């Protein structure tokens, strides 16, 4: 049996840093801005690290152009994750100016530095304005897989992903998103979702399939309270708490032709691609369907009457 000392708990937080959505929030003169969202994320991360000294944290920003690790930063190494000697200043600072726990202070500084660099140096070009959420989740899974390889023989690591979603879903990412969901399910990784704006059908499916929690925040300025109440406890602790009831899951699929969510469609019998309109040839695997037509009845010849 693995003791609490040997059980690692990794929390990967994926933050939606879509500059267009957050820019619209700023134009509305909203009380809730990206900086306040990052502040709430840092408090959640600090609380997670403070719950147990074996708890681990990673934060990923999901932008419209890239997915970037906010923590650990660019100078982080695999050895640093498990407390090996030779840590850089990012993980083992020489001292804390205000007496705070050094790891919490360094984590906050790295997150603030990385998010500022991401938002100031990004140059928005073209028509692509959708958050690369599927890629960020794939990056989180790769990170968890890499960390699992570094776990010692006498240790066990439980991992979960928390997505803080702001912008709307992207139907173009449907296939990649579903692949990520089933990969997480196979690795027993929970996906939780905290949605700030409109509901996300894709994240509802992700939470339902992996056993995570889905919550649409009623009031965005109260984000921190919901993060600490709902998403700070791990899977074992949640059974002892009164949490929001599960929501109705929208299991509509996106068609491969127009990426629209549909309830009834045509499915290719070879590659299982979904289409909203019938096509004699599958555009995915180029299979030609044999169309069974009704039998054609030959017209009966009329008998000519012979005149007497």
From Swiss-Prot:
One GO CC term, this protein: nucleus
A GO BP annotation: transcription by RNA polymerase II
Alphabetically ordered keywords of this record: DNA damage, DNA repair, Metal-binding, Nucleus, Transcription, Transcription regulation, Zinc, Zinc-finger
Keyword Kinase: no
Coiled-coil zones: none
Domain of life of the organism encoding this protein: Eukaryota
ZnF (C4-type) intervals: 268-285
Pfam families named in the record: Tfb4
Subcellular location: Nucleus
Gene Ontology terms, MF aspect: RNA polymerase II general transcription initiation factor activity; zinc ion binding
Cross-referenced InterPro entries: TFIIH_Tfb4/GTF2H3, vWFA_dom_sf
Family: Belongs to the TFB4 family.
Subunit text: Part of a TFIID-containing RNA polymerase II pre-initiation complex that is composed of TBP and at least GTF2A1, GTF2A2, GTF2E1, GTF2E2, GTF2F1, GTF2H2, GTF2H3, GTF2H4, GTF2H5, GTF2B, TCEA1, ERCC2, ERCC3, TAF1, TAF2, TAF3, TAF4, TAF5, TAF6, TAF7, TAF8, TAF9, TAF10, TAF11, TAF12 and TAF13. Component of the 7-subunit TFIIH core complex composed of XPB/ERCC3, XPD/ERCC2, GTF2H1, GTF2H2, GTF2H3, GTF2H4 and GTF2H5, which is active in NER.
Function: Component of the general transcription and DNA repair factor IIH (TFIIH) core complex, which is involved in general and transcription-coupled nucleotide excision repair (NER) of damaged DNA and, when complexed to CAK, in RNA transcription by RNA polymerase II. In NER, TFIIH acts by opening DNA around the lesion to allow the excision of the damaged oligonucleotide and its replacement by a new DNA fragment. In transcription, TFIIH has an essential role in transcription initiation.
Name of this chain's protein: General transcription factor IIH subunit 3
Gene responsible for this protein: GTF2H3
